[in-house]
Amino acid sequence: MIAVLCGVFGLVIGSFLNVVIHRVPQKLSVVQPPSACPSCGNPIEPRDNIPVVSWLLLRGKCRHCSAPISVRYPLVELGTGLLFAAVAVRYDDDLVLPAYLVLTACLIAVSLIDLEHFIVPNRILQVACLLGVPLLVLAAADDGWSHLRSSAVGAVLGLGMLLAIHLVNPRGMGMGDVKLAGVLGLYLGFFGFGHVLLGLFLGFLLGSVLGLLLIGTGIRSRKDHIPFAPFLAAGAMLTLFVGTSFLDWYRG
């Protein structure tokens, strides 16, 4: 039941993330003004703001001017719902669940913004910290206060590792990625610094493999900038799902 509820909640959050993804790079408020069609300016009616369903009923077009509505909107909503449900299945009996739902939402927004605009907005990272810290404290009250120390160490570890890379190669590693690694360390470190190392390793592995494929196929050149935040996010999400099992297997 908790997975179903989180999945439905994720659909709603996904709808809000679409606003975040559109407005944050432009440094606009995510609260006001209400959402409107970018083509005709008519406000989006409540009946047209039902996640996924409204887009399907409208056949991907504005009710007023018939301008096309990007398929990204329902995909973000559906993807967020599915990920929320999956995280709930993995952590349904753990108080750390709310924190990891926050992390999931922030990673979706950061990844899509970085893919489109090549930036990792501080506003989203700040929200991840402001919501994550009290939620992790709440989880630690149930699981043990040592988890907070692990989270703090994880944040320093994630931040420090990528900061070192940035100092050596500033063009290859932006400060947005460095700060994102610190946030990931905060969350993943809750279960130990091994989870932080695994998450970063998977992020670098995925980034390297896809980067080589893009360059090898001629889609990108060595001079092109490839957003790294989506790979860090993917590595973190994989660690949320299989990190503990993998590390237990690795340690024998």
Please describe what each predicted stretch is.
Residues 1-12, 74-79, 84, 88, 97-101, 126-127, 133-140, ...:
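Hydrophobic alpha-helical transmembrane segments
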